[in-house]
Amino acid sequence: MASKIRKVTNQNMRINSSLSKSSTFSTRLRITDSYLSSPSVTELAPLTLTTGDDFTVTLSVTPTMNSLESQVICPRAYDCKERIPPNQHIVSLELTYHPASIEPTATGSPETRDPDPSAYA
């Protein structure tokens, strides 16, 4: 059930306020084994959350495995060598910036300029 998302814990999430067009923000979340015991845990992957018109957040679950640490996308600010208990899964959270949704709307832009200035002559 979607309500079980409350069991997700995240204490290291940071969002760069100067994301560029091609920037992707990723962080590491953990879901406890009590949550993963649900047979419908796969319903969480993928889960897309909307945080406004400019960003799309995608949440996906990766099961814990021996080679997991080499597959984790981790920002430089975090310690990617941290040991992950076998009773936990990794949840990847991606924040993608969509510049097309914040086009300039200031006066004088092509959207607001009079198409025929000579009409006022």
Curated annotation (Swiss-Prot):
<dbReference type="GO" id="GO:0005739">
    <property type="term" value="C:mitochondrion"/>
</dbReference>
<feature type="compositionally biased region" description="Basic and acidic residues">
    <location>
        <begin position="111"/>
        <end position="121"/>
    </location>
</feature>
<protein>
    <recommendedName>
        <fullName>Uncharacterized mitochondrial protein AtMg00130</fullName>
    </recommendedName>
</protein>
<feature type="region of interest" description="Disordered">
    <location>
        <begin position="101"/>
        <end position="121"/>
    </location>
</feature>
<keyword id="KW-0496">Mitochondrion</keyword>
